[in-house]
Amino acid sequence: MSYLLWLTVPSKTLILTAFLLLLAFTTIPVGSMIWWATTANEPKDLGYVEIREYEGIDLSSITAFRENSIRGPQHIDTEDYRLTVTGLVNNELEYTYDDVISNYPVFEKVVTLHCVEGWSVTILWEGILVKDLIEAAGVDPNATVVIFYAYDGYSTSVPLDYIINNNIIMAYKMNGVVLPPERGFPFQLVAESKWGYKWIKWITTIELSDNEDYLGFWERRGYPNDADFQ
């Protein structure tokens, strides 16, 4: 009679019964078994792997840069970070980090940075168009200059036409890796065809202006304001 009753028990019940018996007689704590089950397939952080070649172009390493910022690398918390678009605009805008990287088309460019110190690096930059950010604010017709301000107090400017006509991007990745703090996280201007002092890092404010005589940090110290690389 017992044998017949056993055969009629649903298979799921049999599996559950066997599992409970295993728990009853094993020396492995239940907590340990649950931990193994929930962590076995979790991803392991193996660190970043940067891209070193793109469409046949050899790329420089992220580590090839030299540190020449005015106050050293800045460490910015994305929870507190805000990017402001202000000045000669119809509507001043304030973005969070996620606003910027989630709400605008993303573009990639291989661009070489040339430093006045005599070194250069060729990097695959990934980011959003500056013109998309400022056009969302509504650019005043009188605006001719875009001034960028950084978290460390640095600033520089470029012509508005340069931003628009060259599809200049504000990068948040380089060689497929999110910008590290020393490289300008959360955002760096990719000022192609300009010397490196125009490649402002740790951007916090973008101001539209009609002040074509504005001089940034190095420009006030004698560097050419156009900064065109020849």
Stretches with model-predicted labels:
Residues 73-121:
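A glycine-rich, hydrophobic loop/mini-helix early in the fold
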Residues 2-79, 83, 136-230:
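Extended, aromatic/histidine-rich regions of cofactor-dependent oxidoreductases associated
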Residues 81, 93-96, 126-129, 133, ...:
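Stable alpha-helical elements in mature extracytoplasmic
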Residues 87-89, 99, 117-119, 127, ...:
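A mature extracytoplasmic/lumenal domain signature
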